[in-house]
Amino acid sequence: MGKKSTLAVDNVFCTARYEAAKENIAFQSREATAPILGIDRTRLANIELGKLTPYPEEVLTMSKHYGTPEICNAYCSRYCPLGKSTVKELTLDDLDRLMLKVLGSLKGIEQLRTRLITIAEDGEITGTEQTDFEGVLQELQDVSQNAQTLQLWAKKYIDDFNSK
């Protein structure tokens, strides 16, 4: 069994491998993991130590083999030049907590719809409407983020969802 790297303990890719090793002992060491992933052992070490940024294809391979779809989101939101400015990092909570967040963000959806209709009815956004419109956009962003997190949770934990 490989020993745990203390230098890479906070690295998302190393953490994903350690989690996968709980289910598959082949992921306990970089030496055993590298050929499974098709990534050179030294390159894998440098990725896990934060010295190299993995290629998107490598992240997809890790995600598939480790069963951790959340590392794709982490890659996009932290490392990808385009994603850093457009993708929010999602955090997988327990299902009950996640459902409460989703339900909380949906509770005011009817008022949100009404506000959007009021803002858009004259075909332009005036001074006072702009502040309200920005608030609507933020609420929609919260709904979207909660929906994406729920989809990520389902992809990780529900086998039927994974096969689609």
Which residue ranges define each predicted feature?
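Charged, low-complexity intrinsically disordered regulatory/assembly segments
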Residues: 129-164
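Acidic, glycine-anchored loop motifs typical of Ca2+
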Residues: 90-95, 110-135
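Residues in the recognition helix of alpha-helical DNA-binding motifs
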Residues: 16, 36, 47-50, 74
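Generic structural signal for well-ordered, non-transmembrane alpha-helical segments
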Residues: 60, 100-110, 134-148
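DNA major-groove recognition helix of helix-turn-helix/homeodomain DNA-binding modules
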Residues: 57-75
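Short alpha-helical DNA-recognition segment
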Residues: 21-46
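A short, Lys/Arg-rich alpha-helix, primarily the initiator
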Residues: 1-26, 139
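Short, charged recognition helix plus adjacent turn
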Residues: 3, 75-107, 157-164
